[in-house]
Amino acid sequence: MYDSIKKSCKRYSFELVMCGPFPLTEELAKEDNVRMIIDNGSPSRCAQIAAINADGRLLAHLVDDALFIEDSLDQCVDLYDTVCDKKDVINLRYTEALNFRPTHMHKDYWYAWFHGPLKHTGVPKDYKIACHHLIDTEYFKELGGYDCSFEYQNFNLHDLMFRVQKDGGTLFDSPNNVTNCDWYPNGMVDHKAIEQAYVDNDEPLFAAMYSDPDVLSKRIYIELDNWKQTEELWSRRFSKGVPKDYNEILENN
């Protein structure tokens, strides 16, 4: 993945900031522009911590099961500097299929109401989504970033983009796809905790929140340090303690 990032971003400097329970591999530890912050919290908590510690002018939020397309991030930064004001965001379009196979995503996929779980009265029908996004780092922090009461990174990504749009920002689609993401049709062994978080907490929380037609008028800005209100040890994942490595996670699920 790191090698593909370098090919996607040749003309601009970048830093890869990650957060999670395990240290960097020997190979990544040799790279000057890669940082790992150790934390045992939920995916949302870790993403928030990583984002807060980002130093760059722009913040790109993406996923780890992705391969970056050559020159794609360069093109997105070019577009950002051409069309975006501080409150605007680039939707880093992606494909998702088994073994990173490029696929076509319907143009309506990038609109909230294309997705059943997002069809609530508090979500305007013309709002767009950007699970992978390029945003001004300081503006991200002013907004408060991700709401970490959502444990997994899905609904709080939508929530952030809805808050951006309510605040007057525009979501511009990337010129081309930025990543090809992997997809597992039968789920993954290590995704049990994620599925539980999605079903038991995040989806009902989002539904309750956005059933209010005025929700966005009340919560454009949230506390940046909201991650501190979450579990330091994510109990869904680490009920038996923190494993020594990723293989132990697979064995215990």
Regions inferred by a protein language model and the residue ranges of each:
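Short beta-strand-to-loop acidic/aromatic patch adjacent to the donor-nucleotide binding site
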Residues: 57-67
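Glycine-rich, basic loop-to-helix element that forms the pyrophosphate-binding segment
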Residues: 38-54
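A recurrent flexible, glycine/aromatic-enriched loop bordering the glycosyltransferase active site
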Residues: 115-135
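C-terminal catalytic/acceptor-binding lobe
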Residues: 153-253
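Short, acidic, metal-binding catalytic loop of nucleotide-sugar glycosyltransferases
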Residues: 2-13
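Acidic donor-binding/catalytic loop of UDP-sugar-dependent glycosyltransferases
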Residues: 66-79
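Aromatic-glycine-rich donor-binding/catalytic loop that engages nucleotide-sugar donors
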Residues: 135-154, 166-167
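Short beta-strand-to-loop element that shapes/binds the nucleotide-sugar donor at the catalytic cleft/hinge
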Residues: 90-106
